[in-house]
């Protein structure tokens, strides 16, 4: 199991990755990368229920992919903003279709 880093009271933001089923209609899977002050599980439920949701996640999101982000969380807000972009770019460089991550 991945070792979690120590966190302070201000470290309550998280990055998360959602597996997307055929987001472009070409038969290929993709990912959505986001950040939140909620738990990734709570944020995913909000997406699926249409609450402050990215349409692509509401429509194509199947599940969270914790192996890609769990070892990074939690973190301060500024770090989460940076990490969201870094994580998205890392997945793009590996050839994946990535939404979000800005």
Segment roles from a protein language model:
Residues 49-58, 86-99:
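Short arginine-rich
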Residues 37-81:
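Conserved short loop/helix modules at catalytic or binding sites
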Residues 1-45, 78-86:
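GIY-YIG nuclease catalytic motif and its immediate N-terminal context
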């Amino acid at each position: 199991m991945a070792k979690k880093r120590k966190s302070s009271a201000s470290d309550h933001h998280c990055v998360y990755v959602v597996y997307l089923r055929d987001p472009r209609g070409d038969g290929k899977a993709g990912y959505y990368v986001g950040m939140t002050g909620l738990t990734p599980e709570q944020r995913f439920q909000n997406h699926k229920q249409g609450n402050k949701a990215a349409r692509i996640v509401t429509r194509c999101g199947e599940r969270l992919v914790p192996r890609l982000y769990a070892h990074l969380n939690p973190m301060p807000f500024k770090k989460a903003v940076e990490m969201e972009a870094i994580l998205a770019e890392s997945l793009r460089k590996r050839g994946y279709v990535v939404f979000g991550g800005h």
